[in-house]
Amino acid sequence: MRKQTLLRTLFPALAVVAALASTACSLEQNDYCPGTLPPEPAPGERPFRPGDRYTDYGENPFVNTSQAPVSTFSVDCDGASYSNMRRWLNHGQNPPAAAVRIEEFLNYFTFDCPEPAAGHNIALTHEVAACPWHEGHLLMRLGIKGKAIPDDRLPPTNYVLLIDVSGSMAAIDKLELLKTGFSMLVDVLRPTDNIAIVVYSGREEVVLHSTSCEEANKTKIKEVIASLRAEGSTAGAAALKTAYEIASRYFVTGGNNRIILGTDGDFNVGISSTEELVALVEQERERGIYLTVLGVGSGNLNDSMMEQLADNGNGNYEYIDNLAQLEKIFIHERSRFHTVARDCKVQVTFDPKAVAAYRLIGYENRLMDDEEFENDNRDAGEIG
């Protein structure tokens, strides 16, 4: 066999997983619906707002298989980077390089992968083809697809909506967008699902104790959501603790226990460093309570913190830029809020006789030491 020059590029379409129980995505780049939110500005109309915060993880280099034939990394089911990139382009600007996480561009879309066999939670696929941007190289795509669960067979859910109502959320593409999305979610939930709502600005407040989503209660729940207003500073850490306390109080054994945090990530009261907040969610995740993070807005978007909170909180991170994205998250791909596999890791071993070198595309902040693959105590990504 002729040895491939330099590369068998590893392109893990683990992102395929992100769509696991969802219908195919057919969403286009959409403006906000007339009369509800303003249309997107014309290219260049909105000035650059430099307050967004990203972490630049660099780019994975080529690795010689003679020196390190094994590639090990955690799965990642976030999709925020793609819709955030779309927001930048719709505003006539290029996104910062640090805002681009390639694996999340794949996660955003649904791929036509085979369903898992009976009795299995995931299915594995792979493809190898000529690399379209480098002649003589090969591109390998790995696919992992989670088990599809019909809505009527989803386990009961204990949701705690944790909503940022601080002054920074007053922009029309922040709190109002989240309120619309959460109302959509209420409409599709079942009587076996419960919702509690915690809000925070200068202080946290429980505005709705855990309530069954029976039809008779849905109007009340949506009225609470509609009444929310943005004002004050941002005491996010204290509210996060309160949300975990409520989720624990109403914990559903064998169910889906999840906090959904909607914010721009601008925590400025109490614990505010990413490291301290990550330590908090790491303490809580072992109790079986997962954290989904929904980012909104621009100008002070703390993408770096929100991605780390979701990854370490056994959840996922999405960015919402328009109403079509709300429908995608809360209606068409609601199954992402249900985890079907925990602590998922991937390890690929290349034969140095056939492959000279490889490069993992994306997953720069999900790399693992090879020996961690067999370590069940090492946290990794969830499929949901």
Predicted regions and their residues:
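Bacterial N-terminal signal peptides that target proteins for export
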Residues: 2-13
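Exposed acidic/Ser/Thr-rich ligand/metal-binding surfaces
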Residues: 27-33, 124-345
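Alpha-helix boundary/capping residues
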Residues: 89-92, 109-112, 228, 313, ...
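Sec-dependent signal peptide cleavage junction
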Residues: 26-44
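C-terminal motif of bacterial Sec signal peptides marking the signal peptidase cleavage site
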Residues: 21-24
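Short helix-loop boundary/capping segments at the starts of domains
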Residues: 12, 19, 91-95, 111-115
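An acidic, Ser/Thr-enriched
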Residues: 38-88, 93-99, 116-127, 132-140, ...
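Extracytoplasmic
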Residues: 96-111
